[in-house]
């Protein structure tokens, strides 16, 4: 498995709404993520800095990157664009993080 981590932002007034929309995520999106090899996917909120930290284990970069091309993912991005900084295609502004420590 490949571990990935990334940081995004959430609008300061949208913490509760961001969490509400993920409780639970759409079943169709969950199916897409699992079908594309995503496992143990978590998102953590730093409320003081309005930052979201995502951590996911994936089976392959190619399959993970293909998630973005699915209708379900694009629909999800559109659904979330009003609560977080997003690109013109509605994908969230995201920065990959480099792993510096891991304990199994």
UniProtKB/Swiss-Prot annotation:
Function of the molecule: Involved in the anomeric conversion of L-rhamnose.
Pathway: Carbohydrate metabolism; L-rhamnose metabolism
Native organism: Yersinia pestis
Substrates-to-products reaction catalysed: alpha-L-rhamnose = beta-L-rhamnose
Keywords of the record: Carbohydrate metabolism, Cytoplasm, Isomerase, Rhamnose metabolism
Binding site for substrate: 18, 41, 76-77
Subunit structure and binding partners: Homodimer.
Protein's GO biological process: rhamnose catabolic process
Organismal lineage: Bacteria, Pseudomonadati, Pseudomonadota, Gammaproteobacteria, Enterobacterales
Family statement: Belongs to the rhamnose mutarotase family.
Catalytic residues in the record: 22 (proton donor)
Chief location of this protein within or outside the cell: cytoplasm
GO MF term set: L-rhamnose mutarotase activity; racemase and epimerase activity, acting on carbohydrates and derivatives
EC number, UniProt record: 5.1.3.32
GO CC annotations, alphabetized: cytoplasm
InterPro entries named among the record's database cross-references: Dimeric_a/b-barrel, L-rhamnose_mutarotase, Rham/fucose_mutarotase
Name of the protein: L-rhamnose mutarotase
Compartment(s) of residence: Cytoplasm
């Amino acid at each position: 498995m490949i571990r990935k981590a990334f940081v995004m932002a959430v609008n300061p007034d949208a913490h509760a709404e961001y969490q509400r929309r993920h409780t639970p995520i759409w079943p169709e999106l969950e199916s897409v993520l699992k079908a594309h090899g995503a496992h143990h996917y978590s998102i953590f909120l730093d409320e003081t800095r309005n930052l979201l930290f995502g951590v996911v284990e994936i089976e392959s970069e190619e399959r993970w990157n293909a998630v973005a091309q699915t209708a379900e993912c694009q629909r999800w991005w559109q659904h979330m664009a009003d609560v977080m900084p997003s690109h013109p295609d509605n994908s969230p502004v995201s920065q990959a993080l480099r792993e510096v420590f891991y304990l199994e």
